[in-house]
Amino acid sequence: MTIADHQARILPLFKKLTSLSPDPLPEAERDPRLKGVGFLPRGTLFSCFHEEHLAEAETLAEALVEAKNFDDFIALATNARAVVNEGLYAFAMSVAILSRDDCNGVVLPPIQEVFPDRFVPAETINRALKVDKVSDPNKDTVVPIQKTGNIRDPEYNVAYFREDIGINSHHWHWHLVYPAFYDADIFGKIKDRKGELFYYMHQQMCARYDCERLSVGLQRMIPFQNLDDELEGYSPHLRSLVSGLSYGSRPAGMHLRDINDCSVQDMERWRERILDAIHTGLVTDSHGKEIKLTEENGLNILGALIESSHDSVNKPFYGTLHNWGHVMIARIHDADGRYRTNPGVMDDTSTSLRDPIFYRYHRWMDNIFQEYKHRLPSYTHQQLDFPGVRISRVTVRSKVPNLIHTYSKDSLLELSHGINLKGHIQVKYEHLDHEPYNYEIEVDNRTGEARETCVRIFLAPKYDELGNRLILEEQRRLYIELDKFHRRLEPGKNVLVRASGDSSVTLSKVPTFEELESGNANVNPNEYCSCGWPEHMLVPRGKERGMDFYLFVMLTDYEEDKVQGAGEQTICSDAVSYCGAKDQKYPDKKAMGYPFDRPIQVRTPSQFKTPNMAFQEIIIQYEGHKH
């Protein structure tokens, strides 16, 4: 059977999951391999942050991965679809598809079409359901998306970012590729530097969010600091079609409260133990043995502890700080479940980015990681330099050199694959985008021989919310990675050109359900893995009058950076910076975020710069809505 045949048999299993029968298959009709699943009731919201939900998802994913061949896998998946919770099924099934060798090249259907109720406001879906009853089923009908707030709430100014379908889909897919329960011994594939990727991907989301806040005239976010902080209010305007209930809203001024499975005191205890480990440079494993946090492994160990994942060296002692925090915030309005309400959006990876507290909470997590980073020495001139290689000029080639235009545009989302409709109803929604551009890097190779180089490109705002120039130590945590790629430098002058659409951070194209069904998806199965930052959100919005940014370009020695066992032709090479390379080593020896991952003692770019670096001032200008 071909990849297309496998794709065609998998897609129907993701259709209409919001409309499954509430009653599971009787036990007598269940595959005996499904003995350990079916405990989370259908019609309730699944959370991959909740220990019990995660344990059941792990059991199902393992059973699906262990199916003896593809036909057996499809038979077991079909049986499981009629047994387990709807959200749990989609999660475990997706993890299994990404893990099975006979599913290599199969593209997961976009989660926004599988569960559109997680991405589209309830008012819009309600309108679509009404329109569907009276519209011609043979014609496409378009319903405009409804707004979820207004300018009385300053945070609504960045709703375009928080509610972006692409970034919420990215977060869902990242946690599929790196599920907390992942055990390499069972699934048989490595997840290299998983703990460090957990840190870096979320750190980058926070940096991007702050860039967007500065773009719309808001101050940078204030981190969540203490577990007794009062939280801001938030109403998601989402209603689950699986449960029939709205996602929980949070009035302003509420505090975290104990939930049935975890107390606020547990969270405080875990945080202090993790900080103790950072400050002593030692973690204690479950056998009482001390493990040193080195420059090479420290962040990876801490990432696993903080999340915490299967790789945590001592989960009973260091706890599950990140995951239980998500659940605790999501249940703040009904901590002990007495009102039988749905949790808030923080409970789910495909919805949590909508809530402003997500970014403040993750900046708190990032501050813990930064405690560790501050214990490492700053990079020396020798560690930063690439002797004999000098960047003479960097230019962004667009309509106007060193000026990138951004704008808002409309796109359509099909509802009929996820919701039981008689016709084709599409939602028209607005999202940020940017004009395509190229990086043009002029390099002088004075080594007298051809050299291989890794090109690293970052972007950060030049000024803070008050118009003051940011010093490098403040600015380094705002640097967002735009691209990283490998090139050969011939002796003498070289001009390196790279298109923005080729970024190692972004997904170039997300195929729709319809394109996957028809076989017209037009994606290279060896490159596409669903995990990656959306291409339309590569650069921040900027301001109508233009906003000043530093474009940072650095060339490093590829011979020092390359990793044994990380091939040039990687499976899923579309977005390796945030998602890694599937089943292979992370293709870069340097720390993620290098050279901005460690404290910087000097204040300005000119003091930090080595000849193999360039800080180019550019402007990003927002042009409004494009029809």
From Swiss-Prot:
Keywords: Copper, Disulfide bond, Glycoprotein, Metal-binding, Oxygen transport, Secreted, Transport
Sequence intervals crossing the membrane: none
Tissue: Hemolymph.
Record localization: Secreted, Extracellular space
Disulfide-bond pairs as recorded: C531-C579
Chain sites annotated for binding Cu cation 1: H171, H175, H202
Residues bearing glycans: N445
GO CC term, one of those recorded: extracellular region
Residues given in the record as Cu cation 2 binding sites: H322, H326, H362
UniProt-recorded Gene Ontology molecular function terms: chloride ion binding; copper ion binding; oxidoreductase activity; oxygen carrier activity
Principal location: secreted
InterPro entries: Di-copper_centre_dom_sf (IPR008922), Hemocyanin/hexamerin (IPR013788), Hemocyanin/hexamerin_mid_dom (IPR000896), Hemocyanin_C (IPR005203), Hemocyanin_C_sf (IPR037020), Hemocyanin_N (IPR005204), Hemocyanin_N_sf (IPR036697), Ig_E-set (IPR014756)
Function: Hemocyanins are copper-containing oxygen carriers occurring freely dissolved in the hemolymph of many mollusks and arthropods.
Family from the record: Belongs to the tyrosinase family. Hemocyanin subfamily.
Note: The two copper ions bound each have 3 nitrogen ligands (presumably contributed by His residues) and share a bridging ligand (possibly contributed by a Tyr residue) in addition to binding oxygen.
Protein name as annotated: Hemocyanin D chain
Organism the protein comes from: Aphonopelma sp. (American tarantula)
Taxonomy of the source species: Eukaryota, Metazoa, Ecdysozoa, Arthropoda, Chelicerata
Encoding gene per record: HCD
